[in-house]
UniProtKB/Swiss-Prot annotation:
Its main location: cytoplasm. Keywords: Chaperone, Cytoplasm. GO terms for cellular component: cytoplasm. Pfam families: Nitrate_red_del. It is found in: Cytoplasm. InterPro entries: DMSO/NO3_reduct_chaperone, DMSO_Rdtase_II_chaperone, TorD-like_sf, TorD/DmsD_chaperones. Belongs to the type II DMSO reductase enzyme chaperone family. PANTHER family: CHAPERONE PROTEIN YCDY, DIMETHYL SULFOXIDE REDUCTASE CHAPERONE-RELATED. This is Perchlorate reductase assembly chaperone protein. May function as a system-specific molybdenum chaperone protein essential for the assembly of the perchlorate reductase PcrAB complex prior to its periplasmic translocation via the Tat pathway.
Length: 224
């Protein structure tokens, strides 16, 4: 390879790893709370990591994140209170109706088993299955975000090993087009209507913007 080609490959690897980190952080923030994630959003460490990753993979969104998202991600409540806020927002329907973080609640309601089978197929194509010890379904937002975290990391790995990344790029495009880009706008609308906790409102806002921008970039990369 010449120097210019080397630089282009390094840039693609860096972008893929940064995308992977963003998906991981979104899944952490929108998953069931744990002490470690609460600490990371309380001391600001995870917001810094998110901003650094966005600066690498999506500079235009990094500015929006700094101005509109990050200020709402700073947690000042206890872990117990944060856990209660999550349950109110997404689980208990008490004292107000909760928003749903399941794709099958928002689309294909009449054929959720078919949706689950399709998602299982996506995951199994890459050797992945849901944790048998857990009780999450394949259509949870966190499962889908973690799948994108996996695909973007595998793209970077392929590039580092001088292998073709096309299979991982196509999988990202297909999964975004068929799933996250379709239903995240519906989640955002429901969260805006039902959820008062700005931490979750902000993260869903960021997630929708990020998947839209990522799909646009995938289409460009595959057509280049």
């Amino acid at each position: 390879m010449n120097t210019l080609n080397d630089e282009a490959v390094v840039e693609r690897i860096d972008k893929s790893l940064a995308r992977s980190r963003v998906y991981s952080l979104l899944a952490i923030g929108l998953g069931f709370p744990d002490v470690e994630s609460h600490a990371g959003f309380s001391d600001g460490r995870l917001m810094i990591e998110m901003h650094q990753a966005l600066e690498v993979c999506m500079p235009g969104l990094a500015e929006y994140f700094s101005e509109q998202i990050a200020p709402r991600l700073k947690l000042t409540c206890s872990f117990e209170d944060f856990e209660a806020l999550f349950l109110t927002a997404f689980e208990t329907n008490m004292p107000v109706p909760s928003a749903a973080l399941y794709e099958g609640v928002h689309v294909q309601q009449s054929n959720r088993p078919g949706l689950i089978l399709e998602l299982k197929g996506f995951y199994r194509n890459f050797g992945l299955t849901m944790d048998a010890q857990g009780n999450e379904l394949e259509d949870t937002l966190t499962a889908e975000l973690e799948f994108m975290h996996f695909l973007t990391a595998k793209q970077a790995q392929a590039e580092m090993e001088s292998l073709s990344p096309n299979a991982y790029q196509r999988a990202q495009r297909d999964f975004l087009e068929r799933h996250l880009v379709v239903w995240l706008p519906l989640v955002r609308a429901e969260v805006n209507a039902k959820v008062a906790t700005q931490f979750f409102v902000a993260l869903i806002d960021l997630a929708e913007r990020f998947v839209d921008a990522h799909l646009e970039e995938m289409l460009f990369e595959l057509n280049s």
